[in-house]
From Swiss-Prot:
GO MF annotations in UniProt: GDP-fucose transmembrane transporter activity; UDP-N-acetylglucosamine transmembrane transporter activity; UDP-xylose transmembrane transporter activity
Motif window: Prevents secretion from ER: 350-352
Protein's membrane topology: Multi-pass membrane protein
UniProt-listed InterPro entries: SCL35B1-4/HUT1
This protein's name: Endoplasmic reticulum GDP-fucose transporter
Family, similarity comment: Belongs to the nucleotide-sugar transporter family. SLC35B subfamily.
Keyword Transmembrane recorded: yes
Organism: Drosophila melanogaster (Fruit fly)
Signal peptide: none
Membrane-spanning residues: 9-29, 34-54, 70-90, 96-116, 126-146, 163-183, 201-221, 249-271, 276-298, 305-325
PANTHER family: NUCLEOTIDE SUGAR TRANSPORTER SLC35B4, SOLUTE CARRIER FAMILY 35 MEMBER B
C-alpha cells in the first residue's frame, strides 16, 4: 500500500509525540502518582486553546458536526481520559497501565457484539482470546507486587489495604477501556453522517469538557501545589551573560507532557483520515510496544518472565486480529504478479 507524505509524517509524529509523551508522564508520576487530574486538565486546556485560535478562530468558523453529537462524544472522551490518568493514584504501575490499554481490540469486539450485533470469525476470536489472556496474566502477576505509590504529602492512615486500592485502579482502567470502545463506535457513526473533520473534532472534544474539571478543582489545585514546590531546575535564558531562571522540575515535565500529547493526538487524528484502520491499529500498537520496552529498560520497572509472556500474547494477538500476515502475503503476491506481468510483456510482443 502506497502512503502519501502526510500519512508518513503522521506515523513519524505518532512515534515522536506518543513515545516521548509516555516518558514525561512516567517522570511526572514518579514525583507525584496522584497528578492524573492535573495532567488531564493541562492537556485539555492546551489543546482547547490551540483549537480556539487556529481551528475555531474564536468561534467564527461554523462547526460541521452538530454540537449535540459532540456533547455525547465529549462525555465519553472526558470520562475515559479521567479514568485512565486517575488510575495512577491507585497503585497502578506504568507497564501494567500500557498493557491494559492495549486491550482496546477486545473491548471493541465486545461492544461490536453487544451494540452492533456483529459476527466475527475464528481468527478474530482467537486473537482476542490471546489479548485477554495476556492482560489477565500481566494483571495477576502485578497484583503480587502491589505497593503504595501515594505522594508522601498526601498519605493518610487507612484500614484498607494497598491491594484494595489496586483493584480500584484496575476497575478504573476497565471502565476506561469499555468507554473508549463505545466512543470509537459512536465516532464512526458521526463520521459516516457528517464526514471526517479531525481538527474540529480535536478542538470540541477538548474544549467542551473544561467546565467538568470544576468538580476536581480541589484535587487539581492540591497537586499543582506539589508540582510548584518540586525541585527547581535551572533554565538558561541568556547563556552569554550567565542568566538563569529556576523552574519547578515537575512543571517542566508537565509542560513537555502537554506539548507531546498535542503532537501525539494530532498525528493520530491525521492517520485516521489518511490511512486504513488496519494501518492505524498497527502503528498505534507498535508505538505502545516501543513505549513499554523503553519504560522497562530506562525506568527499570519490574518486569518478569510472566510479564513478557503476557506482553507477547497481547502484541501478537493484535497482529493476528489485524490479519497482518495475510495482508502482507496478499500484498507480496500482488506485487509479484505485477512484476511477472511486466517481465513477460516484452516477450509477448516479440512472439507477435
Amino acid at each position: 500500500m502506497a502512503l502519501n507524505l502526510k500519512a508518513l509524517l503522521g506515523m513519524l509524529f505518532v512515534f515522536i509525540g506518543c513515545c516521548s509523551n509516555v516518558v514525561f508522564l512516567e517522570l511526572i508520576i514518579q514525583i507525584d502518582p496522584g497528578a492524573g487530574n492535573l495532567i488531564t486538565f493541562a492537556q485539555f486546556l492546551f489543546i482547547a486553546l490551540e483549537g480556539l485560535v487556529f481551528t475555531s478562530k474564536f468561534f467564527t468558523v461554523r462547526p460541521k458536526i452538530a454540537l449535540k453529537d459532540y456533547v455525547i462524544l465529549v462525555a465519553l472522551f472526558f470520562g475515559a481520559n479521567v479514568c485512565n490518568n486517575y488510575a495512577f493514584n491507585f497503585n497502578i504501575p506504568m507497564p501494567l497501565h500500557m498493557i491494559f490499554r492495549s486491550g482496546s481490540l477486545m473491548a471493541n469486539m465486545i461492544m461490536g457484539i453487544v451494540l452492533l450485533k456483529k459476527r466475527y470469525n475464528l481468527r478474530q476470536y482467537s486473537s482476542v482470546a490471546m489479548i485477554t489472556a495476556g492482560i489477565i496474566l500481566c494483571t495477576l502477576v502485578s497484583s503480587g507486587d502491589v505497593k503504595d505509590n501515594t505522594h508522601h504529602s498526601l498519605k493518610v492512615d487507612t484500614s484498607y489495604s494497598d491491594f484494595f486500592w489496586w483493584t480500584v485502579g484496575i476497575g478504573l482502567l476497565t471502565i476506561a477501556l469499555l468507554v473508549t470502545a463505545y466512543m470509537g463506535i459512536y465516532q464512526e457513526v458521526i463520521y459516516k453522517k457528517y464526514g471526517k473533520h479531525p481538527s474540529e473534532a480535536l478542538f470540541f472534544t477538548h474544549m467542551l469538557p473544561l467546565p467538568g474539571f470544576l468538580i476536581m478543582a480541589g484535587n487539581i489545585v492540591q497537586h499543582f501545589g506539589i508540582a510548584w514546590s518540586s525541585e527547581p531546575v535551572a533554565v538558561p535564558l541568556l547563556g552569554a551573560i550567565g542568566l538563569e531562571w529556576k523552574f519547578p522540575l515537575m512543571l517542566f515535565y508537565l509542560l513537555c507532557n502537554v506539548v507531546t500529547q498535542y503532537v501525539c493526538i494530532s498525528a493520530v487524528y491525521v492517520l485516521t483520515t489518511e490511512c486504513a484502520s488496519l494501518t492505524v491499529t498497527l502503528v498505534v500498537t507498535l508505538r505502545k510496544f516501543v513505549s513499554l520496552l523503553f519504560s522497562i529498560i530506562y525506568f527499570r520497572n519490574p518486569f518478569t518472565l510472566n510479564h513478557w509472556v503476557g506482553t507477547i500474547l497481547v502484541f501478537f494477538g493484535t497482529i493476528l486480529f489485524a490479519n497482518v500476515i495475510n495482508q502482507v502475503r496478499d500484498a507480496y503476491r500482488a506485487r509479484s504478479s505485477r512484476k511477472t506481468h511486466f517481465d513477460t510483456a516484452p516477450l509477448a510482443k516479440k512472439v507477435e
